[in-house]
Amino acid sequence: MPQLRDSGNHSTAPLDAHTKDEIQSFARIFGIETEYGVSVTGSDRPCDAGQTAMMMFQPIVAEARSTNTYIENGSRLYLDVGSHPEYATAEARDPMDALALDAAGELVMRDLALDAQRRLRSIQGAGSTVHVFKNNVDSAGHSFGCHENYLVRRFVPLKTIEQELLPFLITRQLFTGAGRMGEQGFQITQRADFLDEAVSSATTRSRPMVNTRDEPHADPDAFRRLHVIIGDSNRSQWATMMKLATTHLVLCVIEQAGREGKDSGFARFSFADASAANHKVSRDLTGVEASFDMADGTVMEGGAVAIQERYLEIVERFVGQHPEVCSSLPRTDVHEVIRRWRRVIEAFRSGVSETFADKVDWLAKRRLFDMLRNRAGGRLSVSKLEQLDMDYHDVANGALYASLCRRGAMRTLVNESQAHEAIDVPPHDTRAALRGRFIQSARSHNAQYSCDWTRLSLTSPNRMDVTLLDPFDAQPSDRFLTILEALQ
């Protein structure tokens, strides 16, 4: 949930009863920001990625007079620094809603790319093909990101996040890694070689795993927005849902420990060197062979699986003691999340991780690459495998991922019809519903307007605005209704 402008992140009033209830609950707001890579092949002359991205956004500029806008589902669509189109999902209370919005973003990018491709072919030849990659590393070795956002209670110290959440984020890549083929061979994650700090407020001069820049887009006295940078861009919908849901459950444990002034049980898993641990996890395809130097001076054997087992154990016990956690996610079964989490860990522990190749991106790729190598008698080059790797992530013209889905070799949780619906329909139970309603009304009446995550503004004929500081609140205020009436 990136910020367009300062929109009132500093509260001036005491917490109201509704906000106090939210602080005491386990409810959460989720969001996913995805930067896409762009390239063109088959054209009569070289085509710069930045120019192609601008061509993709020409319809956006024609309508919004900017490369930075919000669409009717409440999500943000914009052209990031350089040549990276970016899509940030609207606020969601549930991982399944965030997943649907993320899938909608893939379709939005595909449509923009294919429209640009049609125009490009009339200029640079019929073979011109626009590729839009939902991955994290381009062919030149440049890295770009997929960032998860979680609304976290303000009373949780940042140091606690670093010590207790980061080991989970690093080791969960067993089932959330997107996989990467390179000259050094195949590894689980795309981002491990590019992240050089554990926690930082910077995003340009360093690449932290968790960003601490304080932009809550909510009441800053009550919440902070946890900006997770370590994750890969997933094509697997199962992996996207699981990374959000399991991280939520770990955060619930951490928050409750903060409320009660107790030990969560996670502190003992803190790494001596998070970056070194991240590299080890990414290169241990078994999930059980790596060993880690811990912050307390000990060495932990058993790889990422051993740490994930401990986190699961604590979460499972916690949910049993706090059944209200189950109602924190409106559309996701917490017990089913725990069952899936246990099964994938057990698969690695038992040496049968390939049974999750229909759910985990890096396992799907490895199975595919191994099969193609065998067909070619082991003579498939690294460059050919890298090409196939890129095709897997191409949401515009890629064939591999779509083929896996059609054949049932990759599990989906949101079908294309549901993803198309999510392009126009925001979640009904967050402030995204109000933003989407405002945008739809303003566009239908050709009104001039602007908005960001916490403010909606009607700019012509009369300037009117409303602040939406509570991301959980989907109920229209009198001020909001007055603005809608002004649009009639």
UniProtKB/Swiss-Prot annotation:
ATP binds at residues 76, 89, 453. The keyword rRNA-binding does not apply. It catalyses: ATP + [prokaryotic ubiquitin-like protein]-L-glutamate + [protein]-L-lysine = ADP + phosphate + N(6)-([prokaryotic ubiquitin-like protein]-gamma-L-glutamyl)-[protein]-L-lysine. Its EC number is 6.3.1.19. The active site is at 80 (proton acceptor). Mg(2+) binds at residues 33, 78, 86. Pathway: Protein degradation; proteasomal Pup-dependent pathway; Protein modification; protein pupylation. Keywords: ATP-binding, Ligase, Magnesium, Metal-binding, Nucleotide-binding, Ubl conjugation pathway. Signal peptide: none annotated. It comes from the Bacteria. The keyword Lipid biosynthesis does not apply. Belongs to the Pup ligase/Pup deamidase family. Pup-conjugating enzyme subfamily. The reaction mechanism probably proceeds via the activation of Pup by phosphorylation of its C-terminal glutamate, which is then subject to nucleophilic attack by the substrate lysine, resulting in an isopeptide bond and the release of phosphate as a good leaving group. Catalyzes the covalent attachment of the prokaryotic ubiquitin-like protein modifier Pup to the proteasomal substrate proteins, thereby targeting them for proteasomal degradation. This tagging system is termed pupylation. The ligation reaction involves the side-chain carboxylate of the C-terminal glutamate of Pup and the side-chain amino group of a substrate lysine. This is Pup--protein ligase. It comes from Bifidobacterium adolescentis (strain ATCC 15703 / DSM 20083 / NCTC 11814 / E194a). The lineage of its organism: Bacteria, Bacillati, Actinomycetota, Actinomycetes, Bifidobacteriales.
